[in-house]
């Protein structure tokens, strides 16, 4: 049996990436609660947790896609004991990873791009704390893998986006595993 692949890059479809996400053993969302306990002594550690800008060679940790080649918000996570961030070419992949029950590594910092400031078609910079961001789930704008979750620093920007492209405005803790299921369903266009 052959596996369906994305025609442009040859990567596995979202259906197969769910397995990759589980195998990646990337941090549990509960690990994010430790972010608020930083002290002055942890200042040098906090400096190393700042977001890293992507370049033409930055690839997604789940599927190897080059982040700079695709539209929509990107994400990065700093896991405990990790020198470099894990990058995601899509916010749906980020949330699917963080919300997966199999995840065991603690996420020390999570960043998404502020699409109220970044260019949707070629986002650069504008990294914000994912826990304080405002999201639009169910909108019509596509990211690297089809419909994605818009991320914004300001609620007004998220509401404007939802008014123009549809979707529901939610906070980080309101996004559920069912909203980011990589195995298929209404969220995904399997005809890609």
Where are these regions (language model features)?
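Short metal-coordination and nucleic-acid-contact micro-motifs, chiefly zinc-binding Cys/His arrays
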Residues: 56
